[in-house]
A protein has these predicted regions:
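Boundary at the C-terminal end of the N-terminal hydrophobic targeting segment
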Residues: 6-8
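Loop/turn elements at helix/coil->beta-strand transitions in domains of secreted/extracellular proteins
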Residues: 11-16, 48-54, 125-131, 201-207, ...
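Beta-strand elements within well-structured catalytic alpha/beta cores of enzymes
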Residues: 12-26, 41-42, 72, 123, ...
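Short, structured active-site-proximal loop/turn typified by the sulfatase FGly-forming signature C/S-X-P-X-R
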Residues: 26-81, 129-132, 477
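His/Asp/Glu-rich, glycine-adjacent segments
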Residues: 71, 76-229, 385-391, 443
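Active-site neighborhoods of enzymes that stabilize oxyanions during catalysis
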Residues: 116, 305-493
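Active-site-proximal cap/lid insertion segments
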Residues: 164, 199-201, 211-260, 278, ...
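Acidic/histidine-rich catalytic neighborhood
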Residues: 258, 263-264, 270-328, 359-362, ...
């Protein structure tokens, strides 16, 4: 990086969002004394730097990578972004939708089709500039550095050589990501921070760096950690100390060389946590249960001709049902003729019952008329109570309970209720959703050690830090935010720090606006 002082076309702070993908709640706070470079970023070299610590930040449902990321950088629940899950069935097109493609543009295309604005759109509309590194969501960004097949191939070869596992090496991924941000990959110099400064003589106002290594390392820690059955907190603290903290040192030096460090506000963020897998459930567990009475897709049967579609799962398993009388996917399946037989077959599977925590069943307000009032999006199905009955129609009806009763089954009950109501659209919602016990995952890869996407605090609550030398003119002092926050709040926070009016219609809010009345003085 060239030495000197860089600036954008106007004065103001430079926001760098460091997204530590999959980092659990309070990992940094609990180990900060062992992280000298994080200490400098958060507290400053003398320990007197302004910061705001938000220890309890709720993710959106599902707490899975791309839907959570999309919601975080749009400020909208999945229902409004169109990215409702990692994989889902579209009842109108009969297609299974996934988010991975060679061009890495599927999320951007979904947002464009739905006229959904991103953080980078709002920044651009305000006359400011933005860049991203490693992020798949790039809609509205002026510059973006992405990865490709060569990058991931190298990462996997390196890990196979070092650790004997054909998965991407997390340290390599994060090191190369920071390289990409600061100076670019071989073909991406012009889109890196150094290249933008050299060719455009400015520094972007918003820069996002997505560091995926924590998530990868949580999925596949080294063999010594697995052999001693390390907890997920131990695994993440180890990775933070040995890999991320040295990277932060490189970042600090790079920004100081460019002459912009004193203007920077860092937002240290995460979009989901991680849990150690306790039980592996074969991902195709439901297929033999339903195949006898329901037509499932196959090489000889298309999705449109099937009458049940089972999604790949993690901590949940989703089942889509067709109305077998009309033969139409957009017609609500009949409760007694379509939904009940599927539920009965699922509950007859002993592996399902040993892992099941809760089951919810979709409602269709104003569309289905079978003698029950349908006024919500879901019922909680009392599967244990139903099992104790004769299993007849009246017992099935009685087992359909208000979704609000989900609060009796989960520590985060109210949050989960809201999340379920704000996840799907009419075209993408499944009819049956199984929710597993903590640590129980539909997972065919027995080498995978950790996972996410569950409805438990370890996955659903993360922590944010807002800090850096550029913060004190806006928010002086050191604060711990006492109320709950949301990953949806990232967009309102960034626009606030840049002096951009709050975009209308967001689902998130700005916890920084009244920080004095909602925080205590920090004591780290």
């Amino acid at each position: 990086l060239s030495t000197g002082r860089a600036s954008a076309g106007d004065k103001g702070p430079k926001i760098i969002v460091l997204e530590f993908h999959g980092l659990k709640q309070e990992i940094l706070a609990e180990s900060l004394e062992d992280l000298p470079n994080f200490q400098e970023i958060i507290k400053g070299a003398k320990g007197d730097q302004a910061y705001v610590y938000l220890p309890k930040v709720f993710t959106t449902i599902p707490a899975a990578s791309q839907p959570a990321v999309t919601s975080m950088y749009t400020g909208l629940y999945p229902q409004r972004t169109g990215v409702v899950s990692t994989i889902w069935f579209d009842r109108t097109t009969h297609q299974i939708r996934t988010l991975i493609s060679y061009s890495q543009n599927r999320i951007n295309n979904i947002l464009k089709a739905g006229n959904v604005k991103s953080l980078f759109d709002y920044v651009g509309q305000a006359g400011k500039r933005s860049m991203t590194t490693m992020l798949m969501l790039t809609k509205g960004a002026d510059w973006s550095v992405k990865s490709g097949a060569f990058f991931w191939g190298n990462a996997s070869v390196l890990n196979a050589f070092r650790h004997g596992e054909w998965v991407p090496n997390s340290q390599y991924v994060d090191n190369k990501t920071l390289d990409g941000f600061l100076t670019g990959h071989i073909s991406a110099y012009r889109r890196s921070l150094a290249g933008i400064y050299k060719y455009h003589h400015l520094v972007p106002d918003v820069m996002v760096v997505q560091l995926l290594g924590t998530d990868l390392f949580s999925h596949y820690p080294t063999s010594d950690l697995k052999e001693r059955q390390a907890s997920m907190n131990e695994i993440q603290k180890y990775y933070t100390r040995t890999v991320l903290d040295p990277l932060m040192g490189r970042l600090i030096n790079g920004l100081k060389e460019l002459g912009i460090y004193e203007d920077v506000i860092f937002i240290l963020a995460s979009e989901h946590g991680s849990i150690r897998i306790q039980k592996y459930i074969p991902d195709d567990t439901l297929n033999p249960s339903l195949r006898g009475q329901f037509k499932l897709p196959s090489c000889l049967r298309s999705n449109s001709r099937a009458d049940a579609i089972i999604m790949p799962g993690a901590c949940t398993k989703e089942v889509y049902l067709k109305n077998r009388q009309t033969g139409k996917w957009m017609d609500p399946p009949r409760l007694l003729a379509d939904v009940k037989p599927a539920v009965d077959l699922i509950l007859a599977n002993p592996e399902v019952k040993t892992s099941l925590k809760a089951m919810v069943i979709r409602q269709y307000p104003g569309e289905r008329h079978e003698g029950l009032l349908e006024s919500d999006q879901w019922w909680l199905f009392d599967w244990q109570g139903y099992e104790a009955t004769d299993g007849k129609d009246d017992a099935f009806y009685q087992a359909l309970r208000p979704l609000t009763e989900l609060a009796d089954h989960f520590a985060l009950g109210r949050y989960l209720i809201q999340g379920l109501r704000r996840q799907y659209t009419r075209e993408t919602a499944p009819d049956i959703k199984l929710i597993n016990q903590k640590g129980y995952y539909f997972e065919p890869d027995l080498d995978k050690y950790g996972h996410h996407g569950s409805y438990y605090p370890d996955d659903c609550i993360v922590s944010f830090w807002v800090t850096g030398p550029g913060l004190s003119p806006i928010i002086p002092g050191q604060h711990i935010y006492q109320a709950d926050a949301s990953t949806l709040d990232l967009v309102p926070m960034v626009t606030y720090l840049l002096g951009i009016p709050l975009p209308q219609g967001l689902d998130g809010s700005n916890p920084l606006k009244d920080i004095e009345s909602n925080s205590t003085r920090a004591s780290f």
